[in-house]
């Protein structure tokens, strides 16, 4: 696999309440100025993840000439970090990340014609763009995403209940004891990830580096989602876009995996006869990472 050419940079982002200037870091594979192909803007998951695990998608630039844009959301990766706001749940909102995304689209000059791939939490932001009829959004891909946190949480409970009893006991013990950072608990979470996050063995380096970056600064993840994978305690716990789905008019491709946390019923309400829907029989929540899938 050849490595496509890329450029990277930072743009200013005015984040009310941040208390300091903020920047959004981005990386573009291919040439945005050519205008021969519609650019694809890739929105990473989390909240609190970084772009690295999605990098296999950059091969689209080499194979098809499609410019592919990645970025790290505020609080993550190469963008401005705000650990001093870790307890301020009024700051860490969906609206903040939507404003950052709008700012990025305009500053990169793609606001008249672009496509979005939103993965997991990134799909929440992508769906919001579509519901709001964002000008210039021509195509949408929602990968491993959700229509409501209630359905997502139900899926997590069911998948956890399917783990070997020993792993379930380990998870429960450390959660009750407040020792979720212990090696034993993290190993149990890792076993769950191997089943329902990425089944490739070994895991791709891009995903390993993503987890490492998350560990350096969990501010966004803990503030918006919660301290563990299995219970949503942050502002996202009440997320539900189902009443607005009929506003989505842009052609949309839905992707989830056979072993995915985003099980079919989690995304089913997105589905309409004029949308595409694919069930990947080999992947968990990282379909882009499977060989030949970029």
Predicted regions mapped to residue ranges:
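Conserved HGGG/HGGXW glycine-rich cap/lid loop of the alpha/beta-hydrolase fold
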Residues: 16-90, 104
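Conserved acidic catalytic loop of the alpha/beta-hydrolase fold
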Residues: 95-114
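Conserved hydrolase catalytic core segment
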Residues: 111-155
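Alpha/beta-hydrolase
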Residues: 160-246, 250
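Conserved loop-alpha-helix segment in the C-terminal half of the alpha/beta-hydrolase fold
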Residues: 235-288
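Post-His helix in hydrolase/transferase enzymes
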Residues: 289-294
